Amino acid sequence: MNQFIPRGTSKISARGLNVHYGEKQALHDIDLDIPAGEVTALIGPSGCGKSTFLRCINRMNDMVDGAKVTGSLTLDGSDVYDRSLDVVQLRARVGMVFQKPNPFPKSIYDNVAYGPRIHGLARDQAELDEIVMNSLEKAGLLAEVESRLSESGTGLSGGQQQRLCIARAIAVAPEVILMDEPCSALDPIATAKVEELIDELRDNYTIVIVTHSMQQAARVSQRTAFFHLGKLIEVGGTEEIFTNPKEPLTQGYITGRFG
């Protein structure tokens, strides 16, 4: 269940984090703190390591052949890579929304109910109904689908599908939501709705978002971390990063000299 962590307190901490895929090193000695109750944007050119870092947080890299993670990564001070840790429970605490909307081939209702069912979060049907409705409401989708919950989630528009995936993620009461370029496949109107939703969700969740759009990072985040060639170049308040970066590489990326 979600637990209270004072806003701004470090929720996730990486120290000396390295990731190898076989012989290739994807992350080099990353030290990064993710504050609770804020949106942290990870930016940088393609292949810079931002998605690799994101996937370390809920151990999605475990599913990649040849992946090796060294160093320290903690969630509320507990080692994410402790061998005794239940990865299923970790992924309940740390939800994920992917680049392309991926609703299950189930009804809208069952898409959202799936997680609470497998984690035993509802004592009865009425409680499950409440979780589903509340999750759809938080995702800004309930008004659009309330009369057709039995219809397939795959029949929704792209933007609605992505908000359904967000509802599915928050239905298990995560503490952290990871978003890997959640708007890259959406049109501008759907993107605006998701961005508005992110702003609303940060009151209750710690959010880490990977984005190729610097404009999006500036709109939705309070902190921004800039990655380049697998290294963390600079991290700070979003306004400071975009208006007064300290590192020449950051300045070059922000101003479009490379990308």
Curated annotation (Swiss-Prot):
Matching InterPro entries: AAA+_ATPase, ABC_transporter-like_ATP-bd, ABC_transporter-like_CS, P-loop_NTPase, PstB-like
GO CC aspect terms: plasma membrane
Pfam families: ABC_tran
Catalytic activity: phosphate(out) + ATP + H2O = ADP + 2 phosphate(in) + H(+)
Domain ABC transporter: from-to ranges: 12-254
Function text: Part of the ABC transporter complex PstSACB involved in phosphate import. Responsible for energy coupling to the transport system.
Similarity field: Belongs to the ABC transporter superfamily. Phosphate importer (TC 3.A.1.7) family.
Quaternary state and interactors: The complex is composed of two ATP-binding proteins (PstB), two transmembrane proteins (PstC and PstA) and a solute-binding protein (PstS).
Protein name: Phosphate import ATP-binding protein PstB 2
Native source species: Paramagnetospirillum magneticum (strain ATCC 700264 / AMB-1) (Magnetospirillum magneticum)
